[in-house]
Amino acid sequence: MPAGGEGPLEGVVQTTSSALREATSSRDYILLTIGFFVCGLQLVFITTHLPTYLVDSGISGDTASWSLALIGLFNIVGAFLCGWLGGIVSKKKTLAIVYLLRGLIIVAFVSLPPSPVIALLFGAAMGLLWLGTIPLTSGLIVTFFGPRHLSMLYGLVFLSHQLGSFVGAWLGGIWYDWYGNYEAMWWLNAGAGLFAFGVNWAIREPEPLAPAPA
């Protein structure tokens, strides 16, 4: 259960409505939900608008496609690695660092001169951080509230992710239509990553229980 929360009494089956009230009154669950909004914002902005950004920067469409492909390829490794790390070190710190690294990689990407090599390196680096947020986020929910209502509680957090996804795709398109570039949107995504780092670092993750003596 979250630090400072009451949690269900041991041996008592918690109702869905009770679990929902507990979660929505939990500071840490709310922070986790806010952070996951940023995840959706970044991921869908990149998948929707990266190809156009690269082509506008003089990079070929083939290279733009390979950059997206590398995101998918390296995501396989990154998601596994983040899930593994979440099992041996602090989940909230690992999650916060994922968001921090995303922000820093975006800063480096838009600060360096565009080139095919930079585009491919960006795809690989972002892929390592792409969906690693999912096992860490769901793991924190289980840590806070147990597994019984995970599908509902994770579903609500994922709704925030999807709202962020909408904002990332829509706002990127609106900005491009108005100004003909993505510069401010990249910096918005970088700043959002730093914001999500702070939000997730502020989560109070319970210490793991020591094993009972034999």
Residue ranges and their predicted role:
Residues 2-31:
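Juxtamembrane intracellular "pre-TM" segments in multi-pass secondary transporters
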Residues 21-84, 168:
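Extracytoplasmic gate region of multi-pass secondary transporters
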Residues 54-55, 85-86, 171-180:
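Interfacial helix-cap and linker-helix signal at transmembrane-aqueous boundaries
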Residues 61-62, 147-156:
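Loop-to-transmembrane helix entry/capping segments in MFS-fold secondary transporters
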Residues 69-75, 79-81, 88-140:
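C-terminal transmembrane helical hairpin of 12-TM major facilitator-type secondary transporters
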Residues 141-150, 180:
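Paired intracellular helix-loop junctions of major facilitator superfamily
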Residues 174-192:
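A membrane-interface helix-boundary motif in multi-pass transporters
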Residues 190-214:
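Multi-pass alpha-helical transporter architecture, strongest
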